[in-house]
């Protein structure tokens, strides 16, 4: 049993190490933390050569008309962005319902909150745009029930840390694949929000939908759940602004009952693409988004004409 004991020890060690770093980072003013994060990201740009090459290749597929200089400039900014995200995640517990508006602008969120107050349940389709943990944390501070799905991590200590962090803003976390997850998901949707991050090519049932003009395998499970439960859907993304604050953005809510899960998945992916085009340096281009996984491909992509528009942001009223 040495193996399980060692894994348990390592998991706890990771949790306490990350928690200690977070406690230290929480004491640093946000602008100072972002400055250190940019420096860390610049270092990563120079050191992580494999990730840099992959990111440059992927952004070249998405923006073939860009010059090499523009691609390199954007990917360098991407590394800096993710360096800042690390410090911001550590800093998140400083946000409260009283202080959130100082650092966060809400775009279109009030429409969804009013529908929740009227008894509607939602599936929130989200992506790794901007600081996605900032998005879930600040939506959690709005006072309506939010539950997010989380795939099991190899390092359980890190997963435990993220779950604890989200809980500070009232966000619940469900581990994907747990025996109780189907029941918990249905419960979460009733009068609340169930969130999925679904912009990556992972080992789960997926469909090919257009992403920057190329078919990309995208998880279909979130759309299936929305259709089967009769939930409404909304695309949720985050965007960092030049002044260091963030926008937590919900696009226009839409009905999922009776819809086609493939078309909904394509619609959501189009919404992600529109946000990425707004701030291309705030998405992880080192991810192999167009990787082929034939064993997980469950259907053919829809035609372009069948994909409804993603919608847009809207009111900036604080929810």
Where are these regions (language model features)?
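A generic secondary-structure micro-motif detector
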Residues: 11, 45, 102, 125, ...
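Short Gly/charged-rich anion-binding patches and loops
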Residues: 20, 54, 110, 134, ...
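A conditional alpha-helix N-cap/helix-loop micro-motif detector
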Residues: 102-106, 155, 175-178, 215-216, ...
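Short, composition-biased local secondary-structure segments
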Residues: 25-28, 131-136, 185-197
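Membrane-anchoring hydrophobic helices of lipid-metabolizing enzymes
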Residues: 1-126, 160-164, 168-170, 309-319
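Non-catalytic C-terminal accessory region of glycerolipid acyltransferases
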Residues: 2-9, 47, 72-79, 114-117, ...
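Catalytic core of membrane glycerolipid acyltransferases/transacylases, capturing the structured
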Residues: 117-177, 203-207, 214
């Amino acid at each position: 049993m040495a193996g399980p004991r060692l894994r348990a020890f390592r998991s706890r060690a990771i949790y306490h190490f990350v928690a200690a770093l977070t406690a230290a980072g929480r004491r640093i003013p946000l602008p100072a933390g972002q400055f250190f994060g940019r420096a860390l990201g610049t270092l990563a740009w120079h050191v992580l050569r494999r990730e840099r090459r992959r990111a440059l290749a992927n952004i070249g597929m998405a923006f073939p008309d860009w010059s090499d200089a523009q691609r390199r400039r954007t990917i360098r900014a991407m590394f800096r962005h993710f360096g800042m995200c690390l410090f911001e995640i550590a800093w998140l517990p400083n946000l409260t319902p009283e202080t959130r508006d100082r650092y966060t602008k809400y775009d279109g969120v009030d429409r969804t909150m009013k529908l929740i107050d009227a008894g509607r349940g939602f599936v929130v389709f989200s992506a790794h745009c901007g600081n996605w943990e900032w998005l879930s944390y600040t939506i959690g501070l709005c006072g309506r029930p939010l539950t997010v799905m989380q795939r099991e991590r190899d390092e359980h200590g890190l997963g435990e840390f993220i779950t604890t962090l989200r809980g500070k803003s009232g966000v619940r976390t469900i581990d994907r694949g747990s025996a109780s997850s189907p029941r918990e998901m249905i419960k979460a949707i009733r009068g609340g929000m169930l969130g999925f991050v679904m912009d990556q090519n992972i080992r789960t049932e997926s469909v090919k939908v257009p992403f920057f003009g190329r078919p990309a395998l995208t998880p279909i499970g979130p759309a299936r759940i929305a259709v089967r439960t009769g939930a409404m859907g909304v695309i949720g993304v985050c965007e960092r602004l030049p002044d260091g604050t963030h926008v937590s953005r919900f696009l226009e809510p839409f009905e999922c009952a009776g819809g086609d899960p493939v078309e909904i998945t394509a619609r959501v992916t189009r919404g992600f693409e529109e946000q990425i085009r707004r701030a291309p340096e705030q998405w992880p281009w080192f991810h192999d988004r167009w990787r082929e996984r034939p064993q997980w491909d469950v259907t053919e992509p829809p035609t372009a004409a069948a994909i409804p528009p993603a919608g847009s942001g809207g009111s900036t009223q604080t929810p």
